[in-house]
Structures are given as C-alpha cells and as structure tokens.
Amino acid sequence: MKSNIVLLINPWIYDFAAYDFWIKPVGLLSIGYYLEKYGYQTYLIDCLDRFHPFNPVVKNKKYGTGKFIRTPVEKPEILKHVPRKYCRYGMPIESFLKALSQIPEPDVILVTSWMTYWYQGPQFAIKILKEKFPHLPIV
C-alpha cells in the first residue's frame, strides 16, 4: 500500500573548492512544498546543510556563511593533472546513513543537482540509495 512518502535529496558537491554562501536547494524545496500541498509527506536530506543535527559542529562566519565539511577523495581521471586536493563537500557519509535510517521508507526518491559538473554528488547519493532501497524509483 502506498503511503505517499517522498524523500528529497540534495547531494554532496565534488570539487576542488566549495564554500557555503547560503546555498540552499530552492528548486527541490519548491517541489517539496507542492507535494505537501497535494497530500504527500516529504522528507529532506540536505547533504550541504552544515547545521544538520547529525553533523559535527562547524564554525560560522559573519551572516551565516562558512566552510563545508570536506572529505578528500580520488580525482576523476580527466582532472588528475590538476595539482589541488579534490574533495567531497557536505555531511559525512555516516551522517547521511543515520539520516536515512531515521525516516520511514519512501515511495519515491527525488535527487537534485546544482550543475552538471557536480555529477559525482548525485551519482554517489544514488548509489547509496539503490543499495538501501533497490526496489524504489529514484528520479
């Protein structure tokens, strides 16, 4: 039986640098608003939410900006020549998995992305989601 639960995911950023200048998934939040308006129950996991309760405490700059939590990762082949560290920015994987375990099983999962260049964030999130919910549609 369908429960009309939708999980919304704003995934990590993979890049050489990223900084939180009030980055919020406005498009995804708008979709969530309309889904709730029409009777769906929504849950949001924002991997870029520096203040998520499962994350380590982060320092805040003036006006709420600040550094994302970052985890060094291997560079894609095409970027190996760039002499800079390549990182996954956003919540630790353990925090993501804990957040997933705290919500009821959804009927569908929606994953967003800020730009094509950051494809690795959605790709990694979808990989984890397919392992946890192999039978669910992921859009």
Language model: regions and residue ranges:
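A short, structured N-terminal alpha-helical element that caps or precedes a catalytic domain
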Residues: 1-139
